[in-house]
Amino acid sequence: MFHHCHRILLGESAFLEIRRIQLDADRELRTNFRVFRGSDYAAVVEAMRAGHSELGYLGPASYGLARRVMGERIAPIFRYIDNEGLEGYHSVMLVKADSPFQQVQDLRGKTLGFSDPNSTSGFQVPGWFLRRQGMDPASFFARTGFTGSHEQGVMAVINGTFDAAVVAYSNERRNTFQRMAEKGMIPSGAVRVVWKSPLIPNSPIVIRKDLPAALQREVVAAFAALPERDPQAFRDMSSDARGLAVAKHEDYLDIVAILEENAARRRERRS
């Protein structure tokens, strides 16, 4: 039996979704878990690197960053299967529904909002794919900037701060702007998609591999059983995902490669 207080650290957008599993984990693992909110993904990575958190929920690119600074001390254990049965999601570029822009090419010389430099769908993946399609954001757009989050990116487009923004998108029934409309934050149909990336593997739940092996096994077993043992807690945790799929480092090798190429480009520009 483990008597320490263990920590699950999450990026801000994941915090409210997973908060309910704290008592469930306490009961199943016979130990105290506490859920904390990180200010951003970089804060979650740093907390895990420093040994202040045992578990985390990271974006794919943030996992790549964590792997770069922690090596094999961190590993993914699960990712969500969404309500359409998919184990991945997309980056999409949004514009106002009543704007004249119909495709990315129409946005040459306009402005683009990224969400966060450590975001997979909000920065790393769209930048890489746009360059591959001959539209380097640094020169294609008149101005780019960071909005701070996916929701703020949607608001920046609606408010006219940026002509377009890139955000996360799982499917028509589960995406950033659909959730905002359901909450009454924006009118339904206020934005539309003009570009969509290939499928990105869903964000991983990660664990520190320097934890006792018995605790790691119990954590994995507890998460694996959660969808059937406490369906409501799982729905709260996952935004109505269908289930969990086992995740491994190899699933994120393409994301790691994109991160390395993006980092190399930044080094070249600085030199």
Task: Provide a role label for each language-model segment.
Residues 1-20, 200, 207, 211-271:
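An extracytoplasmic/periplasmic, membrane-proximal ligand-sensing/linker region
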Residues 99, 111-212:
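Pocket-lining segment of extracytoplasmic ligand-binding domains
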